[in-house]
Amino acid sequence: YLNLGMVYLNLRKYQEAIKFFNQSLVHNKKLTSVYYYLGECYKNINDVDKALSYYILSHHQKTYSKILECYFILNKKKKYQKLISSISKDDPDNRRIAAISAYISHQFNIRNIYPFCQNPLNFILKKNIKKNMENDSLEIQELIEGITKKKFTWELFGKTTVGGSSAYNLTQLEITSLSKLQNILVSEISNYKENFKNENCTFIQKWPKKYKFNIWSNILKSEGYNTSHIHPAGWLSGGVYLKIPSNIKKNEAGIEFSLHGENYPIKIKNIPTITIVPKVYDLVLFPSSLFHKTIPFKSSDERMMIAFDIHKLQ
């Protein structure tokens, strides 16, 4: 019953999904994940009160962010403030909570008290690393050739890429050029942290003493893009740009950062955004809790980048 419910949920046939999820609970009421999926169904059919009641019963990695979202939709500001205050003490570096608290604080016009990164748009940094690469005898073409030996998958299910292909887990491959780039990134990440060392937020003050890289690559074709998302497992995220289409207009092929994502309802329309149109050799760094997406472009050229997160180990 649970599997059938998931099939219908993915097909956006919410009433059918609800029927099968309820049947799965008849057989096993301890399946707390089912309550989360029931919450998803009811939220998608705009029964937010019922969705909230199920989210509260669930134990899922997204449970608290969904409850906060429901409080926002239902305009329950005091309940939102009470819960975010509690979460701030118990779970101060949850990137999903950081993302939604930054957005809801803006929409409710209140101070963002969640300590991870209250003003994430202030922590975007762009730097051209061409000289760094030249100093390490590292060529863009060398990176491109090394990475493209890995199989790229077109519009991989469950990922954010539309009109493009991706190759994941590049850290598992022994690519000399990528190892050289990783050494450059370690240095630039240290510089990034030093640049923001006086900022009073968990993101900086609880910076990882040890971390590991998760590295992948995206290639976008004409009119391709990445939908808005965050990297909840990361601490700091970034990208190095290997190919940028020529003859593009305005912000085409750019990366747009925003407090808004996840199709959150919009009450105040003037939402802060920052758009960067990168050049080849550019490195862009930002908190993993910050929503970002790419802007489609029209060109016969590709847009290719190496993307990465650092994951906190200690």
Predicted regions and their residues:
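Catalytic core of non-heme Fe(II) oxygenases with the double-stranded beta-helix
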Residues: 175-179, 183-186, 190-285, 295-296, ...
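Non-heme Fe(II)/2-oxoglutarate
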Residues: 110-204
